[in-house]
Amino acid sequence: MGIKNLTSLIEENAPSAIKSNDLKSYSGRIVAIDASTSMYQFLIAINTEMGAALMNANGETTSHLQGMFYRTIKLMTRGIKPIYVFDGKAPVLKSGELAKRYARRKEAEQQLEEANEVGNSEDVQKFQKRTISASRKQNEECKKLLELMGVPIVQAPCEAEAQCAELCKGGKAWATGSEDMDSLTLGTTILLRRLTFSEARKLPIMEIELEKVLDGLDLTHDQFVDLCILLGCDYCDTIKGIGPKKSFDMITKHKNIQTVIQNIDRTKNPIPESFPYEEVRELFKNPDVIKCQDLPEIVWKEPDVDGLIKYLVGEMGFNETRVQQGIEKLKKYKDTGVQTRIDTFFPMIKRPRDEDAGSAKKKQKTVAKPGAAGSKKKPAAKKAAGKK
């Protein structure tokens, strides 16, 4: 899910942090991709476009493999070097959210059954989307496919978004590819959304830069984390009556959640029973990840042609001609080679931010910068000429 209303809040208060690009703009970039959100997009897209999931002769769903194979080839032929990161065990704090999701899926399954009986195609499609989730088996199938393609994977001990952020902060990747906005809360330097969307949707990539978000909102990263908790995340409930605008205003004024709590009217804004904000804050700031220095070398290998044909065509029932065409594109990419941009290997240097970021900004606005309008000096040569 990510962070509620964070995208719209950034669009309104830090618009320069967001820009739109096409895929080719990221040629030479290494991108850590959240595999779970990608798989969900593939399952949704193919169900929507085809009206049903793709299946092999044994009745097994293959939509996730279809999407993973062809979209990864598309990324690589555009010069992007993907690293797919898979979720590990969900944190204990997320158990409440997972239980809610399970209940919503069960409810959607019942509604889907009723919509099918009535024959309402719009409702069928709507409820069908709500029942979709990637299974553990589908995760393992995608891992196998990527290994055969020669694409590196990382198994996160916990949340994939947190591991993606660690890869970015440690200089192993330039950006995170995910739909979850909490990637920014976790400290990813650049977030790319819609990276694995179907091309049929014709949506540009949305790029969000964390440092520009903090500048635009005039917050430190610690304050931003507290803002995200107030907005609503996967790990705790929200305070009733405090929406996105009020959350932003209160963090801007009070700087942290504990001071916000001290200054609200608890009759109007009751604190929920489950509001372990200190634990959630710690989870965002120090998540369970494999540190970059402890990871094995990340390498893009030659595709296993025979293995791919055996798996996709022999086991999964894919069209052999199309698979061969995909493999040829992969091989061509490997033969041509795309040079990784040099700045990919260096983590973005964060400028020191005072806890009272607002006062620093005010000072900045009142002091003229060297070379700025109103502070230009006349060239020395002209001064000398005037003395003659």
UniProtKB/Swiss-Prot annotation:
Family: Belongs to the XPG/RAD2 endonuclease family. FEN1 subfamily.
Protein name: Flap endonuclease 1
Transmembrane segments: none
Residue ranges, annotated region (Disordered): 349-388
GO cellular component, one term: nucleoplasm
Post-translational modification note: Phosphorylated. Phosphorylation upon DNA damage induces relocalization to the nuclear plasma.
Function: Structure-specific nuclease with 5'-flap endonuclease and 5'-3' exonuclease activities involved in DNA replication and repair. During DNA replication, cleaves the 5'-overhanging flap structure that is generated by displacement synthesis when DNA polymerase encounters the 5'-end of a downstream Okazaki fragment. It enters the flap from the 5'-end and then tracks to cleave the flap base, leaving a nick for ligation. Also involved in the long patch base excision repair (LP-BER) pathway, by cleaving within the apurinic/apyrimidinic (AP) site-terminated flap.
EC number: 3.1.-.-
Oligomer status and interactors: Interacts with PCNA. Three molecules of repG bind to one PCNA trimer with each molecule binding to one PCNA monomer. PCNA stimulates the nuclease activity without altering cleavage specificity.
Residues annotated for DNA binding in this entry: R71, E159, G232, D234
Gene Ontology molecular function: 5'-3' exonuclease activity; 5'-flap endonuclease activity; DNA binding; magnesium ion binding
Alphabetical list of Pfam families matching this protein: XPG_I, XPG_N
Co-factor(s): Mg(2+)
Region entry I-domain, spans: 123-254
UniProtKB keywords: DNA damage, DNA repair, DNA replication, Endonuclease, Exonuclease, Hydrolase, Magnesium, Metal-binding, Mitochondrion, Nuclease, Nucleus, Phosphoprotein
Record's compositionally biased regions (Basic residues): 375-388
Keyword Transcription regulation applies: no
